[in-house]
């Protein structure tokens, strides 16, 4: 079983005696910067010149500097920008300002684990990764609670990297809920596998396949959408609340029996073999190389995939049906169809 840390396992004064730079001010960046500041930590935010986030960060009372100046001032740097941008940002704007005794923090291990970022030997390399989106991390902290975090140390140059990591996690509010000890390797590989095989790739293609099966068999697209996509939220909510057992307890006897007899026909040993192949590509670095190569080329594959998937018939059907639900109209007012959130 994993080792879990709580507030009593951390000394907040350790992080309060550091100069922290949060690089990036997106979903996670704003939560980290604000929570640390409200925990008595000296925080500055590092942003590129012209960033649209500068005004937002300053309006929330934070000191904003260029990335270079923020890193020069700080002795602890938390990198909270997209994976594909970290390598260049690190090489050009962060690495020149690192000194022995500094600490480099991440919320995801992709670039460190796969070797795209290699810190000097005299620098601590640590991770504090909230298991929730930034606005929830901030909301829970403000309400006196917290979101669970993953904590790990890749390089303990100072001899106190673990103490520093736990202190950071406490300032973030994560140890109110619990900090689960892991490693950069474990966090990175399980995170990528979950995204690709189950949560994003697996789920989206399962929904599409179910939709296609029903429509091809002559059923109305609207009925197919309701049955294989729209009701997904209810199912996921039950699983989040009480696991698969609560889901099966909550559904009808007919649905439960169908789960037992038909689920294994869809998710069979062949699917597990494919999942293992996906995991192999993650573990051996093949996926990382493919992703970075695509990003370095201007993301032609990603753009092609995105454009192609947007044309799937389930999208047009869902767009019309969602208009029938008045409470969904404003549920995603920060989403622009065809755009990318990052």
Swiss-Prot record:
Q: List, from the UniProt record, the residues annotated as the active site of this protein.
A: 108
A single cellular component GO annotation? cytosol
HAMAP family associated with the record = IlvC
Q: Which family does it belong to?
A: Belongs to the ketol-acid reductoisomerase family.
- Please report the name of this protein according to its UniProt entry: Ketol-acid reductoisomerase (NADP(+))
Q: How is the cofactor bound?
A: Binds 2 magnesium ions per subunit.
Instruction: Summarize where Mg(2+) 2 binds, as residue positions.
Output: 191, 227, 231
- Report the cofactors: Mg(2+)
Per the UniProt record, which EC number(s) apply here? 1.1.1.86
Taxonomic source organism: Cutibacterium acnes (strain DSM 16379 / KPA171202)
